Structure formats: C-alpha cells, structure tokens
C-alpha cells in the first residue's frame, strides 16, 4: 500500500461513504457550514509574503488554496442544486490547475473569495439541511466518470475537501512557525 504524503494530505485521502447515515450527513453539513470560519482562522494574520508561499514544494500558494476553495465550492453548490432539481444530470468537471493560474486566483487578495465563501456556504448548508434522505440518494453523473454519484457522497467529498485544504494551510503555519 502506498504511503500518503502527510504534507499534501494532512487529514488523509477521501474515503467515500458506502451508505447513507443521517448522523454523518449532519456532520458533513456542519463542516460545510463551518468552512468559511475555519478557513478565516487558518489564514488570520498572514501577510502577503506568507499568503504567496506554497503550502508544499510544487503546490499552490496559500492564496491560491483560498481561491480554489471558492471555485470548488461554487462548482459543488451547483452540482448539488442540479442533483436536487434534475434527474441524474451530467456535471462538468473544472480544470482546477488551470483555474489556479488565472488572474483572479494569482493576483486578487483573498478577501473577495472569503466573502464569497461566507455567503455561498450559508446557502449551501441551508439547501443541504432542507434535503430529505431521498434527496441525498439522488445522483449526479460526473462527466467522464464511470457511474453516478449520490448527493450524500458529493456532500461527504466536499466536507472533506474543505477540511483538507484548511489543514494544508494550518500545517504550513505550524511547519513555518507562523
């Protein structure tokens, strides 16, 4: 079994749930609701030089991680909405590494993305809290993937995703003594 790089995956890799568990779903919703606050704590007090430091060699800068979380959250929110309102929609992936190179991800301060996350995650959590178990069993079909993804798995994935990137920033701060 391959060893997981603890700098790249400080909380481990994503493990997809095999079945719907209401208690777990509530934990995932809480993580999604809490991401903006947790991320603000992780980046609090960092100066421009620190924000422009890659979290690992060859990795994104802290600022790019923040902007990536805004990009990924927008995509995930829309995937959730499509999954709830359409029958098995095909959802397009986004070229994360290319998006991380765009001017808004490389030049813009992080505050606009943090503000976007505040509003978006409040709406996303409200949507998730309104969903029934049947809604969580609805699916989306990621373009190019084999099979469908139930919305409870999508929710778990993005709960993990936010914690994963926040932990990358926190880990960098700890390693650098910031």
From Swiss-Prot:
Zn(2+) binds at residues 68, 161, 165. Pfam families: DinB_2. Its cofactor is Zn(2+). GO terms for molecular function: hydrolase activity; zinc ion binding. Signal peptide: none annotated. It comes from the Bacteria. GO terms for cellular component: cytoplasm. Its main location: cytoplasm. The keyword Cell membrane does not apply. Binds 1 zinc ion per subunit. It is found in: Cytoplasm. Its EC number is 3.-.-.-. InterPro entries: DinB-like, DinB/YfiT-like, Put_metal_dep_hydrolase_YfiT. Keywords: Cytoplasm, Hydrolase, Metal-binding, Zinc. NCBIfam families: PRK13291.1. Homodimer. Possible metal-dependent hydrolase. Belongs to the metal hydrolase YfiT family. This is Putative metal-dependent hydrolase GK0616.
